[in-house]
């Protein structure tokens, strides 16, 4: 299964705070960034390193740097923006590619309305960010788009994932690893994750919240 649930105590604690029904926009936004940063730490743990020499205070010293492919972070609009600053706090040199995906609330199917990909994205590691992996339709559509653009290495980071969304991504793209703070119970009849976080986009941007 292309999924890794990160059960670090800091992540569990912060995610618990995010589940509160009365959480403020400010606190939800800050926690989304913090958990996004912690997921980034785990999702980049296997990046290749190479050694090189520098002049230190006591002479020449061998140090390491990240080698291999450069990174592009791909927030799925709009909610993915809420994790972006946290991710970039750890990989500030990454380029940002934005993908806008909207979900039909009746059919629960996704359609892409915006794509702003960095040049030569086919030579980069693409790291998709989106707070919720619910039905999986938005994630699958984004991965489809990135692969069509030539991306060969793609990872995804989500705050909360539903089993239905995980299964959808696994069926369509079994080569894509998903990192999540929590695998939740299920989707409700409206396609929202239970227990979930509610509508993450609304909570990040302070717009109308839905009870889901």
Swiss-Prot record:
Lineage: Bacteria, Pseudomonadati, Pseudomonadota, Gammaproteobacteria, Pseudomonadales
Positions with a binding annotation for uracil: 193, 198-200
Transmembrane segments: none
GO-annotated biological processes: UMP salvage; uracil salvage
PANTHER family tied to this protein: ADENINE PHOSPHORIBOSYLTRANSFERASE, URACIL PHOSPHORIBOSYLTRANSFERASE, CHLOROPLASTIC
Binding-site positions, 5-phospho-alpha-D-ribose 1-diphosphate: 78, 103, 130-138, 199
Homology family: Belongs to the UPRTase family.
EC number: 2.4.2.9
First-tier enzyme category under EC: transferase
Natural source organism: Pseudomonas syringae pv. tomato (strain ATCC BAA-871 / DC3000)
Cofactor details (free text): Binds 1 Mg(2+) ion per subunit. The magnesium is bound as Mg-PRPP.
Keywords, alphabetical: Allosteric enzyme, Glycosyltransferase, GTP-binding, Magnesium, Nucleotide-binding, Transferase
Pathway: Pyrimidine metabolism; UMP biosynthesis via salvage pathway; UMP from uracil: step 1/1
Gene name, Swiss-Prot/TrEMBL: upp
Activity regulation, short description: Allosterically activated by GTP.
Its biological purpose: Catalyzes the conversion of uracil and 5-phospho-alpha-D-ribose 1-diphosphate (PRPP) to UMP and diphosphate.
One Gene Ontology term of the molecular function aspect: uracil phosphoribosyltransferase activity
Keyword Nucleotide-binding assigned: yes
Protein name stated in the entry: Uracil phosphoribosyltransferase
Coiled coil segments of this chain: none
InterPro entries for the chain: PRibTrfase_dom, PRTase-like, Upp_B, UPRTase/APRTase, Ura_phspho_trans
Catalysed conversion reaction: UMP + diphosphate = 5-phospho-alpha-D-ribose 1-diphosphate + uracil
